[in-house]
From Swiss-Prot:
Principal location listed in the UniProt entry: cytoplasm
Name of this chain's protein: Ribosomal RNA small subunit methyltransferase H
Organism: Nocardia farcinica (strain IFM 10152)
Catalyses which reaction(s): cytidine(1402) in 16S rRNA + S-adenosyl-L-methionine = N(4)-methylcytidine(1402) in 16S rRNA + S-adenosyl-L-homocysteine + H(+)
Entry similarity comment: Belongs to the methyltransferase superfamily. RsmH family.
Keyword Methyltransferase on entry: yes
Enzyme class: transferase
SUPFAM superfamilies: Putative methyltransferase TM0872, insert domain, S-adenosyl-L-methionine-dependent methyltransferases
Localization of this protein: Cytoplasm
Protein task: Specifically methylates the N4 position of cytidine in position 1402 (C1402) of 16S rRNA.
Enzyme Commission numbers on file: 2.1.1.199
Gene3D superfamilies (alphabetical): Putative methyltransferase TM0872, insert domain, Vaccinia Virus protein VP39
Keywords from the UniProt entry: Cytoplasm, Methyltransferase, rRNA processing, S-adenosyl-L-methionine, Transferase
Keyword Methyltransferase: yes
Length: 324
């Protein structure tokens, strides 16, 4: 699929709301916008067009996404720096753009999870609706695949991954069946795994909670790509990069991600004065203030136009004090 085809199918999620939240930090001359999950560049193109003085630092671990985004953003070539890295590489990416890792950024967007392009390309193995190689790597140039996890992990490690990252009730039962089947034939395709899940998860449980493969595929994807560990490292680095008045928007698509984001923002919006002191110490107040009340969701109209917006949870914050 070429850039035009991808662009026609990719609709940026919560674009107008992201602009409302980030826009006040992007109007000043020389503002720096970091898109930590560049994807096909839909959000970035919007901001570069709307804010003519804006400078973009775009990150993505997917080399094909970077290539396509580079083509899409070619009209803004003098204002962009694109870096092949995970979002926890934000400090190094800023360095490549000639910027310090702290206090140099006006706005940051993190649109987490698997991209539309990755879901649409069957050979990437992210979708359980088509039979494809069990890959699931966001960076197809490195790392283990989902097949490697299924074919080499111990029963205990498999059950841990399925339970912790997929919140799968039948993690132990599924792990046992994986071990049994791989002794006869290693797993190669998503269809083999989907068939196992239909056979292993009780019929009553399959009737609720969506597709029976949803939780297992999520767990494998998170494990293969180190998504939660990367997010835990990325959020502090992203928040540190923001100048006073700088803003961040994070969009999560599953509860595990949103929980990490919620906890980090809660910590950064709390007073830094020791709890046993009766008054707030100068310079020890909260570094950030929340811009959203809880996690915001897409409206019915947007979900109807773009079904992939249905699970999104958006949180945002603004730096109000310099880092101590």
């Amino acid at each position: 699929m070429n850039r035009e085809q991808h662009g026609a199918r990719h609709v940026p999620v919560l674009l107008e709301r992201a602009d409302e939240l980030l826009g006040p930090a992007l109007t000043e001359p020389g503002a720096v916008y970091v898109d930590a999950t560049l994807g096909l560049g839909g959000h970035a193109e919007h901001f570069l067009t709307r804010y003519p003085g804006l400078r973009l630092v775009g990150l993505d671990r997917d080399t094909e996404a970077l290539r396509l985004a580079g083509e899409r953003l070619a009209p803004f070539a003098e204002r962009i720096t694109l870096v092949h890295t995970r979002y926890d590489g934000i400090a190094d990416a800023l360095g490549q753009a000639g910027l310090p890792p702290t206090g140099s950024v006006s706005a940051i967007l993190m649109d987490l999870g698997v991209s539309s392009m990755q879901l649409d390309e069957a050979e990437r193995g992210f979708a359980y609706s088509v039979d494809a190689p069990l890959d699931m790597r966001m960076d197809p140039t490195s790392g283990i695949t989902a097949a490697d996890v299924l074919n080499t992990y111990s029963h205990g490690d498999l059950a841990r991954v399925l339970k912790n990252y997929g919140e799968e009730r039948f993690a132990g039962k599924i792990a046992s069946e994986v071990i049994r089947r791989r002794a006869h034939k290693p797993f190669e395709t998503s269809g083999e795994l989907v068939e196992l899940l239909y056979a292993t998860i009780p019929a009553a449980a399959r009737r609720t909670g969506g597709h029976p493969a949803k939780r297992t595929f999520q767990a494998l994807r998170v494990e293969v790509n180190g998504e939660l560990d990367s997010l835990r490292a990325a959020l502090p680095a992203a928040l540190d990069a923001l100048r006073v008045g700088g803003r961040i928007v994070v969009m999560s698509y599953q509860s595990l991600e949103d929980r990490v984001v919620k906890q980090e923002l809660a910590a950064r919006t709390s007073s830094r004065t020791p709890v046993d002191l009766p008054v707030e110490l100068p310079g020890m107040g909260p570094e950030f203030r929340l811009l959203t009340r809880g996690a915001e969701k897409a409206g019915e109209r947007e979900i109807a136009e773009n079904p992939r917006a249905a699970p999104v949870r958006m949180r945002a914050a603004e730096r109000i004090e310099a880092a101590s």
